[in-house]
From Swiss-Prot:
Gene: gcn3
Originating species: Schizosaccharomyces pombe (strain 972 / ATCC 24843) (Fission yeast)
Keyword Protein biosynthesis: yes
A single BP term in Gene Ontology: negative regulation of TORC1 signaling
Example of a GO MF term: translation initiation factor activity
Protein name, per record: Translation initiation factor eIF2B subunit alpha
Family membership: Belongs to the eIF-2B alpha/beta/delta subunits family.
InterPro entries the record matches: eIF2B_alpha/beta/delta, elF-2B_alpha_N, IF-2B-related, IF_2B-like_C, NagB/RpiA_transferase-like
């Protein structure tokens, strides 16, 4: 019997395994690891410690581990993609099983090989994507993305001269990390307010963003603000490319922004009744602390806002992936068909 609970514990006949804690430790120990790869690492570790005696028990452990991860982690879009692809990989490997113990060892070893290949995706993406960065061009990117950084750093190493606008990317402020990464590589950068994107767009030659997930119709799920970049880019006739590893292709088909599964209610109106006392909340630190700190949103207000948005495929010029630069409208569905059929 295999069980799991909301605390992140997978319970099976051989004991307990805190898969959410293991997943978080992988992310903490390796800043370069992506969420789906960390999820696959945690699942491989779960399977390697299991003493399952049958295929059914083995698959139950894997299924419960995946479900526990999805339920125990907020913003689990890319994590879910990694779990689903790894489950499909394991299912395919179970055909024509002879000796189960030998098969189990083979699966764990192949799982580790799967991780190695997933980790190598970013290098291939950088190699495929850097030719899009032309000499003398100006790039606009949104916050921090390891994939986007890899493409830009690959271009810089080949002595391509370019400049980068980086959005601050509130509320995370991850644009600060991207700016620091690019400056360390001697790439000229300028951080811009999220609200200044439309003002900046006419000076831009190419928009390059990352993705938390790429959905079935080729649309993107990414940090909030990505869609507005895409809208402004399309209006200004600027190419808009997204960088994403193929293990971020996710079996979802959101029809609107509200189809993204958030872990809590968002955009709730507060209670303006005179009976309700609203104490003045403490402002939280942000990159804008030096300017009118008393006017920034507090933590409660930030939590009431979405962290992700959906960019429809018609706004995406192409996807830079480890499988090549593919058309967002047809390429993703074709690759998902190959994976799941």
């Amino acid at each position: 019997m295999v069980e799991s609970d909301s605390s992140g514990i997978v319970r099976h006949s051989q004991g307990e395994f805190d898969i959410v804690q293991v997943y978080k430790k992988f992310l903490q120990d390796d800043p370069e690891i992506t969420m789906p790869v960390a999820a696959i690492e945690a699942l491989v570790q779960l399977l390697s410690r299991s003493q399952a005696k049958t295929i059914s028990e083995f698959m139950d452990i894997l299924q419960n581990g995946s479900n526990t991860l999805k339920e125990g982690v907020q913003n689990n879009i890319s994590l879910s993609a990694g779990c689903d692809i790894f489950q499909r990989f394991v299912t395919r490997s179970l055909h024509d099983v002879g000796d189960f113990e030998q098969c189990k060892r083979h699966l764990v070893e192949n799982g580790k090989l799967f991780i190695q290949r997933a980790r190598a995706c970013r290098q291939r993406i950088a190699h495929l994507g850097y030719p899009l960065i032309r000499d003398g061009s100006v790039i606009l990117t949104h916050g921090f993305s390891r994939g986007v950084a890899a493409v830009l750093l690959a271009a810089a190493k080949r002595h391509v001269r370019f400049k980068v606008f980086v959005t601050e990317s509130r509320p995370s402020g991850s644009g600060c990390l991207m700016t620091r990464t690019l400056k360390n590589a001697c790439i000229p950068t300028c951080m811009v307010l999220d609200s200044a994107v439309s003002f900046t767009m006419n000076r831009v030659d190419l928009v390059l963003v990352g993705a938390e997930g790429v959905v079935e119709n080729g649309g993107l799920i990414n940090q909030i603000g990505t869609f507005q970049l895409a809208v402004f880019a399309k209006h200004a006739h600027k190419p808009f490319y997204a960088v994403a590893e193929s293990h971020k292709f996710v079996r979802m088909f959101p029809l609107s922004q509200y189809d993204i599964p958030f872990s809590r209610p968002i955009l709730e109106f507060d209670d303006p009744s005179p009976e309700t006392v609203h104490p003045e909340p403490e402002p939280i630190p942000t990159p804008s602390d030096a300017i009118h700190n008393e006017l920034i949103m507090n933590e409660e207000q930030i939590r009431n806002n979405p962290t992700l948005d959906v960019t429809p495929p018609e706004f995406v010029s192409g996807l830079i992936t480890d499988l090549g630069i593919i058309d967002s409208k047809s390429g993703v569905s074709e690759e998902l068909i190959k994976l799941y059929l």
